[in-house]
Design a protein with these regions (language model features):
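N-terminal accessory targeting/assembly segments
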Residues: 1-194, 205
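A broad, low-specificity signal marking well-ordered, structured residues that form hydrophobic/aromatic
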Residues: 52, 129, 195-196, 230, ...
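Histidine-centered divalent-metal-coordination microenvironment in nucleic-acid enzymes
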Residues: 123, 130, 234, 239, ...
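Generic beta-strand/beta-sheet core signal
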Residues: 132-134, 199-201, 246, 253-255
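A short secondary-structure junction signal
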Residues: 143, 209-211, 256
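Carboxylate/His-rich catalytic cores and anion/metal-binding grooves
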Residues: 191-195, 201, 262
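N-terminal pre-Walker A segment at the start of P-loop NTPase domains
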Residues: 205-241
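Glycine-rich phosphate-binding P-loop
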Residues: 240-262
């Protein structure tokens, strides 16, 4: 495999050449603690950004296996790492200058849902993160010095801060994993009790608008009717009460954006 120094030499050699010369840098490069893969190079600085990925082997990342030894914990950790990585690279986007999308650094930006995403995947041997980089140019003339800044000055710190356990907020990670375990416990209880849904007391259901994930300001917290209230004893959180919706036809009424579908 080619080394990071090979990438720097190649980028230096194509500086001020026509933009298609960037395609010569496609491939994987060893940065010692992680592998940088340039998977697709954009056609010009105004086209969709280039596709890039990094891989960090578990032996170097150091995340304990018990943090991702079930599908739901794995998804929770992937989601957390992706959110961290999105914030890290977002601070550096467009710090490198040029025309069009030059200097853009971005990845998937999750909403409130915790879902399995290809932007960050924990595999058998490594963690992979996929993102986009706008390869810098002035007009259609390569400005490889700015791409060297991205790959050698900006990116290593982002990877170190996010994908190495020793640099992470371990208490926050533990909280996310405990929440994932509690959520899975509730899902299992729904099946066991023949329920289709559970709405916890204290939930804030109304949204700002029909296209917003943010809670409505000044909204009233949900309070279950006594006739429908049950209590579940979660392994992490402990007892939690709320409304159980049994299998069958249930009619829910209310004003617009008041949380009926939430």
């Amino acid at each position: 495999m080619k080394q990071s120094a090979d990438l720097k030499r190649l980028l230096t050699s194509i500086d001020h050449k026509s933009y298609p010369a960037y395609k010569d840098v496609r491939g994987a490069y060893d940065f010692n603690t992680y592998i940088l893969s340039i998977d697709h190079v954009q056609g010009d600085p105004f086209a969709s950004p280039s596709k890039v990925s990094i891989q960090v082997r578990h032996a170097k990342a150091g995340f304990p296996a018990e943090l991702f030894d079930t599908p739901w914990k794995k998804t929770a950790l992937e989601d957390y790492l992706l959110r961290c990585f999105s914030r890290e690279i977002g601070r550096l986007s467009f710090k490198a200058k040029g025309s069009g999308k030059s200097g853009l650094i971005a990845t998937s930006h999750p909403g409130q849902e915790v879902l399995s995403r290809t932007a960050c995947e924990i595999g058998r041997n490594e963690i992979t993160a996929r993102f986009e980089v706008g390869f810098p140019a002035f007009g259609r003339t390569i400005n490889s010095g700015e791409l060297i800044r991205i790959f050698f000055d900006f990116l290593p710190g982002c990877v170190e801060n996010v994908f190495f356990y020793r640099r992470q907020n371990t208490a926050e990670i533990k909280k996310r994993i405990t929440l994932a375990d509690d959520q899975q416990f509730i899902r299992n209880e729904l099946k066991r009790l023949d329920l289709v849904s559970f709405v916890a007391d204290g939930s804030i259901l109304p949204r700002e608008t029909g296209v917003s994930d943010r809670p409505m300001k000044g909204s009233v917290a949900f309070h279950s009717p006594d006739s429908l209230r049950i209590t579940l004893n979660l392994p992490g959180h402990g007892p939690i009460s709320g409304m159980a919706i049994h299998r069958g036809i249930t009619l829910i009424v209310g004003g617009g954006y008041h949380g009926k579908s939430t």
